[in-house]
Curated annotation (Swiss-Prot):
This is GMP synthase [glutamine-hydrolyzing]. The keyword Nucleotide-binding applies. Disulfide bonds: none annotated. Residues 206-395 form the GMPS ATP-PPase domain. ATP binds at residues 233-239. It is an enzyme of class 6 (ligase). The active site is at 89 (nucleophile), 179, 181. Residues 12-205 form the Glutamine amidotransferase type-1 domain. Coiled coil: none annotated.
């Protein structure tokens, strides 16, 4: 069987994007059940879906009202394909509105719901098989279904939602007003699994090995016999992309490792030894530290920093590519979380991402982003499946802009050194305590704040370093890590004693949301 025919044989469930910031969680949950799933635009037509030939379709949640003049719609022929369709929140309202039911502002009907609610099942349904008749679900809707379309029947309700679940088994259409993809819906995973396996007929045989086969085939088809340039940042994402690309196209890949002066301690040498030595990647190391730091001098705004770094990265690549022949593609380690935070057609921008929002319009390369449907933990699983060792796969995430976004305000050599040295101490102590796998991400930040201190018999007026340590599954949400006090004490004592120009340590105890993982 050829790679392309093997790809066509992989079962797929398509999630249509209607604007929820957590849409990819639906696809992610379905992939956990061994069924491949990915997002597509809500503009997709019935014919395009026929060509994809999915075993199921999910209509996601979203912030709009289905009755608004600018509401995101759907090709009505999609409902005639005979493919099982699950509408979630806005998706259920869209099914209702399109097929002749009634949706009204919940304030008018008194059915507005935000937060956990108790769902009561009123009739048996394959969608809810194996779940209790009463269960906690997460509701988040400002509109409500007050009349379901002809051919549908009520499956479940709640105190404030008369139609919390409905179905038309003849047409294989299902609607739920709550969000099964989030953890607050206690049996949400069971519901999505029932849809993917029992209703859609998923075999549950998709794995990261399948993803590797799919991406290799896609890369080879896209690239042909042309050449690809990859920017290595020293982080997990670009390292995994490098190994994947080498597996796909071999010596057609050239890696550019830009030392922009914003790397962690000893990072440059480690990258060369790890990826060039162990994995045999062809890496050109470029010392562009003065070039970057000169451009960043006096810049305080975090968005401007990101744009400058993103632009300059590409210009450096352009300079290096001009020395090579026939380079047409630029590969990046963009993850789905980066795309979400940078905003999409249906989702608002939280902050621009260096792999998404910092690229100049006159860029001379086509982009290849093999990881842009994956979350961080899936990237680690991909690295393991590619045979990469734990010290690479479990390396701490590191943003493309590097320490520039871990120095608040203007970047100076002195500030950079405080972060570089304090971060090294933090990583050493976390490793000594055996907490590397328990803490999802950890790093230090120069807050830009100076405070008065006493060292020896003298007064000091030096920087405050913040420690950021979080626990998370996929980076979409996170909690601050509850590090043992004795570990925090060791870290604090070492930093103030070993790092010049630092006299105070604080611990960031903010979750995401409301904060993001990085400070800038």
């Amino acid at each position: 069987m050829t790679e392309i025919s093997m790809l066509n044989d992989i079962q797929k469930i398509i999630v249509l994007d209607y604007g929820s910031q957590y849409n990819q969680l639906i696809a992610r949950r379905i992939r956990e059940f061994g069924v491949f799933s990915e997002l597509k635009s809500h503009h997709i037509t019935a014919q395009e879906l026929r060509d994809i030939n999915p075993i199921g379709i999910v209509l996601s949640g979203g912030p709009n009202s289905v009755y608004a003049t600018d509401a995101f719609g759907i090709d009505p022929e999609i409902f005639e394909l005979g493919i099982p369709i699950l509408g979630i929140c806005y998706g259920m309202q869209l099914i209702t509105h399109t097929l002749g039911g009634k949706v009204v502002p919940a304030g008018q009907a008194g059915h507005r719901e935000y937060g956990q609610s108790s769902l009561r099942l009123r009739s048996a349904s394959a969608l809810f098989a194996g779940t209790p008749d009463e269960q906690l679900v997460l509701m988040s809707h400002g509109d409500a279904v007050t009349e379901i379309p002809e051919g549908f029947h009520l499956v479940g309700d709640s105190n404030d939602c008369p139609y919390a679940a409905m179905e038309n088994t003849k047409k294989r259409l299902y609607g739920i007003q709550f969000h099964p993809e989030v953890r607050h819906s206690v049996y949400g995973n069971d519901i999505l699994k029932n849809f993917a396996i029992s209703i859609c007929g998923g075999r549950g045989d998709w794995s990261m090995d399948n993803f590797i086969d799919m991406q290799i085939a896609k890369i080879r088809e896209t690239v042909g016999d042309r050449k690809v340039l990859l920017g290595l940042s020293g982080g997990v994402d670009s390292s995994v992309v490098g190994v994947l690309l080498q597996k796909a196209i071999g010596d057609q890949l050239t890696c550019i490792f830009v030392d922009h002066g914003l790397l962690r301690k000893n990072e440059g040498d480690q990258v060369m030894e790890m990826l060039g030595g162990r994995f045999g990647l062809n890496i050109i190391r470029v010392d562009a530290s003065k070039r970057f730091l000169d451009l960043l001098a006096g810049v305080e705004d975090p968005e401007k920093k990101r744009k400058i770094i993103g632009n300059e990265f590409v210009y450096v690549f352009d300079d290096e590519a001009s020395k090579l022949k026939g380079v047409d593609f630029l590969a990046q380690g963009t993850l789905y979380t980066d795309i979400i935070e940078s905003g999409t057609e249906t989702a608002q921008t939280i902050k621009s991402h260096h792999n998404v929002g910092g690229l100049p319009e006159d860029m001379q390369f086509e982009l290849i982003e093999p990881l842009n449907t994956l979350f961080k933990d899936e990237v680690r699983a991909l690295g393991t499946a590619l045979g990469m060792p734990d010290e690479v796969v479990w390396r701490q995430p590191f943003p493309g802009p590097g320490l520039a976004i871990r120095v608040m305000g203007e970047i100076t050599a002195e500030k950079l050194e405080t972060v570089r040295e304090s971060d090294a101490i933090l990583r050493e102590e976390i490793a000594k305590a055996g907490l590397e796998r328990d803490v999802w991400q950890y790093f230090t930040v120069n807050t830009g704040v100076r405070s008065v201190g006493v060292m020896g018999d003298g007064r000091t007026y030096d920087y405050t370093i913040a420690i950021r340590a979080i626990t998370s599954i996929d980076g979409m949400t996170a909690d601050f890590a509850q590090l043992p006090w004795e570990v925090l004490k060791k870290i604090s004592v070492r930093i103030v004693n070993e790092v010049d120009h630092v006299n105070r340590i604080v611990y960031d105890i903010t979750s995401k949301p409301p904060a993001t993982v990085e400070w800038e």
